[in-house]
Design a protein with these regions (language model features):
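Active-site proximal loop and beta-alpha junction motif in alpha/beta enzyme cores
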Residues: 1-72, 78-286
Length: 286
């Protein structure tokens, strides 16, 4: 059985930067979960997506890391949406369905850009164990921001948001997996999303994974939305409004995640977008 795939870079306007993604735009009927896991492990990208159903108003897909299936993830969302729209398989405004539910997506083919609207945020409690988080990041407790709290917020997945004193300190951070596991277990977060505000509309972030086999992620759209809510709700980085998160430089894959977070009733409308480039294609022989 031949299964076509595309190689995609998301959250970048430059090929071979951003976060890598493998997209299977038309998954054969009856293709098993075990085969999807095998192909995700074969690519060894942070995520591989399988489009399993197309319908007039959208499509359904599944997302796999080399270790697990995810209910939702950011760069697979914009990368898959752009790939399908660029090939005429879907419209430029459509609904993507995953295990999490429906996610509206918009594609700008001329610009090579895509946006997703994430779920309305749910705020978790603030987390005060600075010691374990500092250890997880290879830092000292005093390197964390002295005034801003750590907090879990979810718009689909739930990162522990970790404000760092400044950009220089953030660049010094080094992931220590055992402490990452302890920090996520204690806080209820699914990863650590460290960030430093550099100015209005300008934020640097790094994602340290605890359990998904990713290590340090070049671009994390599922964490960018919660960070946007954190910033907007506190009036940081010139938000509410628009901002850009720079991520991935420390792992050689510079990425830029665009935020547009604005009040919506008593909650927030959370949009995350970025550039997408299709850089290759091929066939799995299964």
């Amino acid at each position: 059985m031949d299964v076509a795939f595309r190689l995609v870079d998301a959250f970048t306007e430059t090929p071979f930067q951003g976060n890598r993604l493998c997209v299977v735009p038309e998954t054969p009927v009856g293709f098993s979960t075990e085969l999807m896991k095998m192909l995700a492990l074969e690519t060894n990208f942070s995520e591989t997506t399988f489009v399993t159903e197309s319908r007039p108003d959208g499509y359904r897909m599944r997302i796999f890391t080399p270790d697990a299936e995810l209910p939702f993830a950011g760069h697979p969302t914009i990368g898959t949406a752009y790939t399908l729209a660029s090939e005429g398989r879907t419209s430029t405004e459509t609904i993507q369905t995953t295990a999490l539910g429906n996610i509206p997506v918009e594609v700008d083919l001329e610009r090579g850009f895509a946006w997703m609207t994430q779920k309305q945020p749910v705020f978790g409690p603030e987390f005060d164990d600075r010691g374990v988080v500092a250890e997880a990041a290879g830092l000292e407790s005093d390197d964390l921001h002295p005034e801003l709290p750590m907090q879990v917020i979810t718009t689909g997945l739930a990162p522990l948001l970790v404000p760092i004193r400044d950009e220089e300190t953030l660049r010094r951070a080094e992931r220590y997996e055992p402490a990452c596991r302890r920090a996520t277990a204690a806080s209820g977060g699914e990863c650590l999303y460290l960030f430093a505000v550099r100015g209005d509309g300008d934020v640097m972030a790094r994602m340290f994974d605890a359990s998904l086999g990713v290590g340090e992620d070049p671009a994390t759209g599922s964490a960018a939305g919660p960070l946007g809510v954190y910033l907007a709700s506190r009036g940081l980085a010139g938000m509410p409004g628009e901002a850009v998160i720079a991520q991935g430089e420390m792992v050689g894959r510079p990425s830029f995640l665009h935020l547009d977070v604005r009040p919506k009733g008593e909650s927030w409308n959370v949009r995350v977008g970025g550039g997408v480039r299709i850089v290759g294609e091929g066939v799995f022989r299964v």
